[in-house]
């Protein structure tokens, strides 16, 4: 039996939602705000809304986006201690985030290995940012989550495992 912690990132490990902060700083408000409202009032799925939000951002701004978030990201008090406790107890700890690899992984690099992070992938190869969804909803979820935490949990879970979701 393995005990696994699956922990959210934006607004849980960090004190703010990084996607919202990024969009408020770089996306045109007249295009971003309706998408944000749609996601919050659930008229748009997270996958659809967040995908459309990132499509507002020119790909050539990647360095500026990352610098902005690295400057502002604050890791919540107690996170490091939670990781230390998990390691001492032999608890498998993973981040399952609706955030994007280009900022989630560098922010967490001092704490976790990349293999412990499940998130979406930002593609900067075109004129605007495109999001790939490697952890999208499986056949048991139709919510359009983007990074579907329950799907990741089902993928990782083995018989007898205990899953703790934060």
Residue ranges and their predicted role:
Residues 47-81, 89-91:
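Metal-dependent phosphoesterase signature
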Residues 14, 45, 71, 141, ...:
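Catalytic cores of large soluble enzymes that bind and process phosphate-bearing ligands
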